[in-house]
A protein has these predicted regions:
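Histidine-centered phosphotransfer motif of kinases
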Residues: 193-201
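Short intrinsically disordered, low-complexity coil segments enriched in acidic
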Residues: 1-4, 8, 12, 102-103
Length: 265
């Protein structure tokens, strides 16, 4: 007798007498359903929460207003490229990432560090305002060479790409917790084959490159000082949680020694 197993709103048969069809073949006929190559689990994509679209558009508009209003002009080419990178990141996120990830990131709970993500958002907005005032009005430290501004924009795009890659291959939560509801396991593919916390490496590079891309040494210093200690603290705290609570992570950490920077840390 063939027993159905229910995943999401579908019944999938583990065995079929003819032997011709496989579970993967059946799932290929179901839209927005995939097999996780690492865990063997089935994921059925639902719609992206509307609140995620609203938050993303609001965040983009906030960045644009903070930059151009503080600068007093919209005639800054690098600022438009900066915002275009933002827009591209949002679009790729909507098309590529699991909507369950978005639901997790906007859901309260977990073990938040002392410095909350809301405070980090406030710091980001503040550094946009500082950069705009510096470059567009007061010219305190707007002496970043043009080649370094464009190089920083490339670094920014690469950093966001690394972050999206990490989020795609492993469920990337905004809180520190073991995700038992998703059957969390150790992932050793993608960027996790080389460093244990590629998402934090991407975040570090974003914080270093953002102010430079906006032509402000002052904004760069402000953002770096305010955020890098938080990112390093969070990487260490998450490592401790995973070492004690996630089966197999200790062996993985022994194989992949580096948290963020291969050869350094």
């Amino acid at each position: 007798m063939v027993r159905p197993r229910r995943y999401g709103s579908f019944h999938v048969y583990d065995e079929i007498k003819s032997g011709f069809h496989t579970r993967k073949a059946i799932l290929s006929l179901i839209p927005k359903t995939r097999i996780d190559s690492d865990t063997g689990r089935f994921h059925t994509r639902g719609p992206m929460p509307v609140s995620v679209y609203i938050q993303s558009v609001a965040y983009f508009l906030l960045a644009a207003v903070a930059l151009f209003a503080s600068a007093g002009t919209v005639a800054i080419a690098t600022y438009w490229v900066y915002l275009a990178i933002f827009a591209a990141v949002f679009i790729v996120s909507f098309l590529w990432l699991d909507p369950d990830l978005a639901r997790e990131r906007i859901r309260p709970g977990g073990k938040q560090p002392p410095i909350t993500l809301q405070l980090i958002s406030a710091v980001l907005v503040s550094h946009w305002i500082i950069a705009g005032l510096d470059h567009g009005r007061f010219h305190w430290t707007d002496t970043v060479p043009p080649w370094l501004q464009w190089l920083s924009l490339l670094a920014l795009a690469a950093s966001y790409a690394l972050c999206l890659w990490a989020m795609h291959v492993r469920f990337f939560s905004s809180v520190i917790r073991i995700q038992n509801d998703r059957g969390q396991v150790v992932i050793t593919t993608g960027p996790y084959a080389y460093i244990r916390h590629p998402g934090y490496l991407a975040g570090t590079l974003v914080m270093l490159a953002s102010g430079l891309a906006l032509d402000s040494w002052l904004a760069t210093a402000f953002l770096t000082i305010c955020t890098l200690p938080f990112l390093f603290y969070r990487a260490v705290a998450e490592d401790r949680v995973l070492l004690t609570q996630l089966p197999g992570y200790r062996d993985y950490a022994a194989r992949v020694r580096w948290r963020l920077l291969p050869g350094l840390w």
